[in-house]
A protein has these predicted regions:
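Active-site hotspot residues in diverse enzymes, especially metal/ion-binding acidic/histidine motifs
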Residues: 1-200
Length: 200
């Protein structure tokens, strides 16, 4: 007799404590505030990881390594070593201001800060069913990276190219953040309309 597990093969997935986009956005803002970074300023992510984060966590190290040592990966966070390993090519691109490389480092920063081994669990899930996005650590790290580097609340009136240039993020991240900024503006307008009530 074929079981449901045989019909729907399971895959192993990492599970993080649930966080929605609003909570992650607040965490990104709080980190900027803790580091003394204005909300509308570009973040020098390399200097932050090499100089600022070790002040908060003296045991932390950003470790560029030859590309061949991270085959198939751009970077890897190892919380138990208090380190983020990054391909030299990605590190060099981030120093030059490459948007994707900067996003990769900010993504790994999120893993380091919020996804310690104590907080991550693993489960076998049905590969045909979508995992709740609020517990997906990769999605959480993607959102954090975008909100930390290009806060959605600071993008009013900007184009995709404006966001890329001002905040140093990839085109995809800029588009996604502008979409989030538009969603926030609509929600605020809707709340304001409800508070004002019907006009006489």
């Amino acid at each position: 007799v074929e079981t449901s597990v045989q019909r729907n093969p399971a895959v192993r997935a990492a599970i993080a404590p649930p966080k929605d986009r609003n909570k992650i956005r607040k965490e990104a803002f709080q980190l900027r505030k803790q580091l003394g970074l204005p909300r509308d300023a570009s973040v020098d992510i390399v200097s932050l990881l090499e100089l600022a984060l070790p002040v908060i966590d003296p045991s932390f190290n950003l470790l560029p390594v030859p590309d061949k040592e991270l085959s198939g990966r751009y970077a890897e966070t190892r919380p138990y070593e208090h380190a983020i390993y990054v391909k030299e090519s990605v590190y060099d691109a981030a120093i030059r201001g490459g948007g994707q490389a900067r996003m990769i480092l900010a993504h790994e920063l999120a893993h380091y800060l919020y996804h310690s081994p104590r907080e991550i669990s693993f489960a076998y899930v049905n590969r045909n069913e979508r995992l709740d996005s609020n517990v997906d650590p990769e999605r959480q790290a993607d959102i954090f990276a975008a909100e930390f580097l290009a806060p959605s609340g600071e993008l009013r009136g900007l184009s995709v190219s404006d966001v890329q240039r001002k905040f140093g993020v990839s085109a995809l991240a800029a588009k996604n953040q502008l979409r989030q900024a538009s969603n926030i503006a609509r929600r605020h307008a809707s709340k304001k309309k409800r508070r004002s009530g019907p006009k006489a």
